[in-house]
Amino acid sequence: MTSVVSSARRTIRIGSRKSQLALVQTYWVREQLQNSFPDINFEVHTMSTQGDKILDVALAKIGDKGLFTKELEVGMINEEIDFAVHSLKDLPTNLPEGLALAAITERENPADALVVHENFKDKQIDTLPAGAVIGTSSLRRLAQLRNQFPHLTFKDVRGNLNTRLAKLDAGEYDGLILAAAGLQRLGMGDRVHQILPKEISLHAVGQGALGIECRADDAELITVLKAIEHPETRDRCLAERSFLRSLEGGCQVPIGVNTEINGNELILTGVVASVDGQNLVKDTVSGNASDAEAIGIRLAELLREQGAQEILNTIFAEIQRGS
């Protein structure tokens, strides 16, 4: 591809978290860009985020505004790095002033996956015995699974994927609910025991996609980053992020989605659930994919009419109390 970067700019600095998964994702993005722009030197710079440092507290109790992104965003604003690679599900829907979501890469499988201890290899999520201990750090997964499987025991789990799997194999848990995409990217796809269908668990907003963030005024760099954008994934994720933004939810609240595109039609399903799983509202809206953000807003309004705001208000109050 013909270079669109000025001759004075031959090095572009990429910001990444230090986790194994983050680095795998960042180096994948670097490889795609290097293939398209061989004359540019793409350097990876790593940073630790708040979410990487606090591993003994449930995510929902920390607060989630930029938990895995803030330090990278400060680095961009201070021009220490030029762009950052995020798991899109971790990127807040309202970005800091001066930053932009420049590109969204093609999505991996966005579904949640069940990984089980060897004692339960013959079970599925709906056949696990009463009292089986399932690990998840996500209120979204917790709420939906409690709604359908109240006989299971759910326990918080933190740490990187290897740490979580080690805890599972040591018998601390009977099963884990993890993002299928993360397991696949780390070459651990063989650990997936069951892909949870959307009827059981709607995935997180942006799950399975990578979001590339940079300074909004860096038009030259944005042109470079657009080379690895996947338009269909962007439409789907813009609808999902608009839905989440309209509900004023964050990355850690029990809000799940599913998007499908048939021709020009985008179909968005969303759910809002109470943490105990007792209250759950769910519906679907469709429209032209070119109106992705409007579809998200319409779905948020529809769920509000069905009681979603009351559910969210209760959750926010519980989080503030630290319960």
Curated annotation (Swiss-Prot):
Pfam families: Porphobil_deam, Porphobil_deamC. GO terms for molecular function: hydroxymethylbilane synthase activity. It catalyses: 4 porphobilinogen + H2O = hydroxymethylbilane + 4 NH4(+). Its cofactor is dipyrromethane. SUPFAM superfamilies: Periplasmic binding protein-like II (SSF53850), Porphobilinogen deaminase (hydroxymethylbilane synthase), C-terminal domain (SSF54782). The keyword Aminoacyl-tRNA synthetase does not apply. PROSITE patterns: PORPHOBILINOGEN_DEAM (PS00533). Coiled coil: none annotated. The modification S-(dipyrrolylmethanemethyl)cysteine is found at C251. It is an enzyme of class 2 (transferase). Keywords: Chlorophyll biosynthesis, Porphyrin biosynthesis, Transferase. The keyword Transferase applies. One of its GO terms (biological process) is protoporphyrinogen IX biosynthetic process. Binds 1 dipyrromethane group covalently. Pathway: Porphyrin-containing compound metabolism; protoporphyrin-IX biosynthesis; coproporphyrinogen-III from 5-aminolevulinate: step 2/4; Porphyrin-containing compound metabolism; chlorophyll biosynthesis. GO terms for cellular component: cytoplasm. Its EC number is 2.5.1.61. Tetrapolymerization of the monopyrrole PBG into the hydroxymethylbilane pre-uroporphyrinogen in several discrete steps. NCBIfam families: hemC (TIGR00212). Belongs to the HMBS family. The porphobilinogen subunits are added to the dipyrromethane group. Monomer. This is Porphobilinogen deaminase.
